[in-house]
Amino acid sequence: MPKKKTGARKKAENRREREKQLRASRSTIDLAKHPCNASMECDKCQRRQKNRAFCYFCNSVQKLPICAQCGKTKCMMKSSDCVIKHAGVYSTGLAMVGAICDFCEAWVCHGRKCLSTHACACPLTDAECVECERGVWDHGGRIFSCSFCHNFLCEDDQFEHQASCQVLEAETFKCVSCNRLGQHSCLRCKACFCDDHTRSKVFKQEKGKQPPCPKCGHETQETKDLSMSTRSLKFGRQTGGEEGDGASGYDAYWKNLASDKYAGASYHDEEEDEYEAEDDEEEEDEGGKDSDAESSDLFTNLNLGRTYASGYAHYEEQEN
């Protein structure tokens, strides 16, 4: 019969289990919940943005910096991990920070573990929006990940991209390499593959996971579990042409929408314009005739005396 576990042994086993779960869930944590991608409101301009060392809009330093690795705003003296020893019970503000991350542009506290591990494990290392190709330093908003293709997205394009992400770049759901129905879909390549053509010599399939895409290696998903479509949806701020300064907005989108909406009625509009032009010409002709008649009526009773036109001028010359 096994020995009964003591209280200290139970606590140690529970602690080891919690640490194991934390290590396992650290790689699968949501990008929006990372401390380096947390929401921050500037103390000076009151504008909400991503967690940064300096405000993106007014370049002011925050009163309570947030560590990009552990997310704390206060460093306690009890923790012996501090690189910079502080005399007080705790330290806040600039006395707590130790570095600025080059990837996420956020403060890192002066803890030895955070300083040595954050730069290698920063989730925003290659965070460039797949739609507008802007990085962390190019805009002030937070970074998100598409729930389908897992590419990085900025705040401006996250909803529009995810609304149009489940669209294949093909007219059918057939496999790219053959005519059989594609049972697995890669949402990065926007293509379907059958069971035979998902097997790749380059990318190996891990246990308990879906087969990788033979083109890019991204994990595929079953087509039946997705709301896949083969139509091309044209909407959003990225569909319009760029302006002179390189920026694109919603003006081109609304113009395209209006042109598509009234494209079917253009033929009828042209006919109506022709009829209106003919009516205007007829009205002008009638108006011209009426004006001539009115002018003739005005000059009928006008008497200019004896003139050459009246035929009496030669009598006056003879008298003289």
From Swiss-Prot:
Motif (Nuclear localization signal): 3-11
Record's keyword annotation contains Lyase: no
Family label: Belongs to the NOA36 family.
Keywords: Centromere, Chromosome, Metal-binding, Nucleus, Phosphoprotein, Repeat, Zinc, Zinc-finger
Pfam families: NOA36
Protein name (Swiss-Prot/TrEMBL): Zinc finger protein 330
Residue spans of biased composition, Acidic residues class: 269-287
Sequence segments annotated as region (Disordered): 1-23, 206-250, 264-303
ZnF locations on chain (C4-type): 42-58, 67-104, 129-149, 175-189
One example GO MF annotation: zinc ion binding
